[in-house]
Amino acid sequence: MKKTFLLGISFVSFLLHIGCQYRLVKPKELRTDLLRNPDHVKLNGEVQELMLNNEILSTNKYEISKIQTKTPLFNWVLDDKSKQSISYQLLVSSSVKLLNKNKGDLWDSGKINSTAFSQLYNGKELKTEKVYYWKIRYWEKEEFISEFSEPKAF
């Protein structure tokens, strides 16, 4: 009985140790053209609790950061628990709904083998005066894939 109990405790400890090694991580601090918060919507300089979308973009009521280039530069930071990425995948979509389904209708970079933390857009032509959304995930080791980041509008 005592051996069974000790074996059970050892097994649970082992599982907890393994579980700590395979943690849920995702990229953070996403930037578009080096802007940290291009998705913030402001009114008289105050950040509003609104998500940047095409309707807000078309009104002159709010202040926003407009990304006008057709090839924006995307940057990100690894999760604090990660050491180094060996590759990444970037998705750009015309709607947050598509992006939440992991569909990049404008660009799916596929797996890019690189340790870089930035990538120039290389998808379908972007139009000015339109809102787009992007997210990214990375591989830390060949067998370890992070979760996708939270979507970011630009």
Could you describe each region identified by the protein language model?
Residues 22-79:
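Pro/Thr/Ser/Gly-rich low-complexity, intrinsically disordered linker/stalk tracts
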Residues 1-4:
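Positively charged n-region of N-terminal signal peptides that target proteins for export
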Residues 8-14:
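Bacterial N-terminal signal peptides
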Residues 78-84, 140:
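Extracellular acidic, Ser/Thr/Pro-rich low-complexity tracts
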Residues 150-153:
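Terminal edge beta-strands and adjacent linker/stalk segments
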Residues 85-131, 144-147:
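Recognizes extended acidic, P/S/T-rich segments that occur
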Residues 18-19:
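C-terminal motif of bacterial Sec signal peptides marking the signal peptidase cleavage site
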